[in-house]
């Protein structure tokens, strides 16, 4: 189920457009995640008290977390499925410390695609979107596999 060279070209090409403004992209991803799937916000003690979009937008912690999420994802994507060294500690923390269900990874991955499509409509056509979805599915599947290794059924 790996990606072809052409698919990786699409993924890394759009990621190069995302990277210069990870904080804005990441902030939007986190806010959208909380809007569309409010149950995910309950996983974050530091975000539980943020009740409005304005509060979420003005939170430096939301921006910081969004940047952290997309920075980690970018490192994994750039490794083109040779991501074991980056993925293992991420999966371990999400499985054993944070207890983030795989379902939530599905939610955030789809939101990442939507946010990129909104911010880069002319650069993120159907082929690029399909390639990104495939790369993110690979990431989720590998995270789920690691979760099981850590005894978390997530």
Curated annotation (Swiss-Prot):
Per UniProt, residues of the Globin domain are: 2-148
The keyword Cytoplasm appears for this protein = yes
Q: Which InterPro entries match?
A: Globin, Globin-like_sf, Myoglobin
> Annotated Gene Ontology MF terms?
heme binding; metal ion binding; nitrite reductase activity; oxygen binding; oxygen carrier activity; peroxidase activity
A single Pfam family it belongs to is Globin
List, in alphabetical order, the GO biological process terms annotated in this UniProt record. Answer: removal of superoxide radicals
Q: Give me the residues that bind O2, please.
A: 65
Question: Gene3D superfamilies, from UniProt?
Answer: 6.10.140.2100, 6.10.140.2110
Q: Where does nitrite bind?
A: 65
Quaternary structure, from the entry: Monomeric.
Question: Can you say what this protein is called?
Answer: Myoglobin
Give the organism the record lists: Graptemys geographica (Common map turtle)
